Amino acid sequence: MMLFSVRFISGFVFGAGSGVAALKLYYYEEQQTHTGSSVHRVIGRFGLPESGAESRFYTNHVLSYDQTHRTPRWVAEHLSSTRLLGEANRKQCKFRPDPSVPELFTAHNEDYLKSGWSRGHMAPAGDNKSSEQAMAETFYLSNIVPQNYENNAGFWNRLEMYCRELTEKFSDVWVVSGPLMKPQITDDGKKTVSYQLIGKDEVAVPTHLYKVILAQKDPSSDALAVGAFVVPNAPIGFQHQLQEFQVSVCDLERESGLVFFPALQKQQLSDLCTVDSCQLMDFRRFSLYISSRKMQSANSVYRLEKILAELQEAGIAPDEHLKQIYQQRRTELERRQDTNTHT
């Protein structure tokens, strides 16, 4: 797994999260050629400042952790139609500090409590149904940023779903996600960066979130398409299209201080939104999807009927798929109720 992970990350992101081995080799070569190497040895006699592991490897994702902000700098994933399969259930998962992050630099659940911000995944739980461990690791707070509730459950959720849908059209999809602090221009024309800190650990609330998507149609082909998107950490309605938030990879690299997919010649990449539609789920499809999820977890017939009524109040007629879920879940709940009555 380590060999795969090193190859995996070397082609994903270089910058704040560059490979430790490459850095050590660089410093070694510098020491061998620089005439002041003895001075450097004295300077580093008791060690040089450290910012933690540059890259952290997990079952199904890789990330670089920002010990100052208590959030990830970036989180990298690889998606395919087969890798998305599995039966892992998030009901068994709990948010908790990453055991690999020193206690001094980790966020805690208490930081988010009553903060007004949700715990937003960068590597989504929905991408990690392949194993219980892979899904559980996405709930480490090293993979989490303070995110607006509506954005998390709405637009960002739809963007994550779009990434998964791409695996139906492309053989391989790589995704890099993370937080961003964008400057604001004050009345006097000056640029300033301002962001909230929450909890006793002072977890930084990003002003924006980014996602870079790289898609390959055929493993035997060099044809690749890329799309970079920056969205505000705020509610975004259904009237907005994903293309409104598309930026050039170069501009995102300049703002983030990261270089994405450094092994590629980016000028040779196609635009994802030209190759594909970059179309997120509309209000109707998304409402049906959310209702189906709610029905599958409903614990009473009353709750099941309420979900159906809420959907109809929104003017959306259930499709055949939702009707099947409704009937199946209703039968299960009624059988459970009969069993409890006779025991």
Swiss-Prot record:
Entry annotated with the keyword GTP-binding: no
Keyword terms of this UniProt record: Endonuclease, Hydrolase, Membrane, Metal-binding, Mitochondrion, Mitochondrion inner membrane, Nuclease, Transit peptide
Keyword Membrane: yes
Catalytic class of the enzyme: hydrolase
Any Gene Ontology CC annotation: nucleus
Cofactor: a divalent metal cation
Protein role: Endo/exonuclease with nicking activity towards supercoiled DNA, a preference for single-stranded DNA and 5'-3' exonuclease activity.
Family label: Belongs to the DNA/RNA non-specific endonuclease family.
Protein name: Nuclease EXOG, mitochondrial
